[in-house]
Amino acid sequence: MGHFFSANNRQRAITTRLQLDEEIVLFRQDQLISSFLEIAVDQTAETARILLQTTDWNIDQAVNLFLTNNAMYREVVDSTTSGTSDDSDSRSSFSFPPPSYILHEGLFEYAKYVSIEKNLWLVVNLQSRTELGSHILNRDVWANDAVSRTIESHFIVWQVYDDTNEGQKISSFYKIEAPPPVVFVINPITGQKMHMWSGVIEAESIVEDLMMFWDAGPHENIASLTRNRRTETAETCLSSYNFYETPAPSWGEEFEEEDNWSSRSNNNQVVAPTWEKELEEQDEWEIWSSRSDTDDFVPPFMGDEYEDPDEVKEEEICLVFPVLTEEPKGDCDRSVVCSLCVRFPDGRRKQRKFLKSEPIQLLWSFCYSHIDESEKKAFKLVQAIPGASKTLDCEADATFDQSGLANSLISVTWE
């Protein structure tokens, strides 16, 4: 009988402990909700609960998300108050909806078809319904003005969740091992993966990387690859005939054995012809003969004292630019800041922020500051525009906002 009461008491103790743990959890959640409401004034407890559940009850993240997306949270509350309290995954998936104006609706194959028809690169975004990183990507990257402008005329964005059939097929085919969110660019014609981002994805870095695809669309990329293959094939065919080629220092074992036998026999020794000297002499003769046939002979460069003083003066004037101002900080209001990506002749790319109200001459100052001393000479800036290009005027009296240069790709070319 005593044993029976002992087991009963043990069961009651376990039940009491579980109830106590649950009450402690609820008490802590109520504390977090109260703390949130002290910071987010005039908000409801339901708003606080939704945000805290979205961030796994992390008060700092919940407050940060609220402060940066206050308007979006009202939509979250409206769309989720009608749901059940257990449906946290569904509620979380609506916290940061992707901006519909940059997304392509439909299946993957149709997105590829549209990309091919419009000659646009296809950006695939593998998302998670529950991971906070996916919602932050929607909020901080896809909703970013610079990202939207970069994507607008060069890319199609197709988003898919990792728990869907299409999402699983994409993960398997492209061997995606990183957890969502994952973003990658593919050539819709070949399906080749060109570039990929995963983990914490910053808006500035993805803009800079995406601008590399502005130079050419998928069709031009395929044409370039085809030309390269044809060139390689032609070079291979020509090299197989060994026309006008100087023999390599080593001919291989069987040729060396033949040479040794030939030297031992002291008979007619065959020496491979070398065309290098004859070609050099011929080229030199052709150069000088062409010079003698024209009166417009231009002497070689003889030093600075032989340069036209007017040209030197003009070049020096062109290289005088205003003092470069300090770059706006990250906490600056986005509505007054623009970002530009500059591509230099040596292939380097630099990104720089300017105030929209600043004069465009500062762009020349920025470019000049990143050119090596040995290469500093007159240059011009060209704005990359799909299907065309626009040479910028250094003397134009305009701001970045007025000129339309905000969030564009600029190329530095020599005069």
UniProtKB/Swiss-Prot annotation:
Disulfide bonds: none annotated. GO terms for cellular component: nucleus. Coiled coil: none annotated. GO terms for molecular function: ubiquitin binding. Keywords: Ubl conjugation pathway. Residues 19-69 form the UBA domain. Residues 333-413 form the UBX domain. CDD domains: UAS, UBX. One of its GO terms (biological process) is proteasome-mediated ubiquitin-dependent protein catabolic process. Gene3D superfamilies: DNA helicase RuvA subunit, C-terminal domain, Glutaredoxin, Phosphatidylinositol 3-kinase Catalytic Subunit, Chain A, domain 1. This is Plant UBX domain-containing protein 16. It comes from Arabidopsis thaliana (Mouse-ear cress). The gene is PUX16.
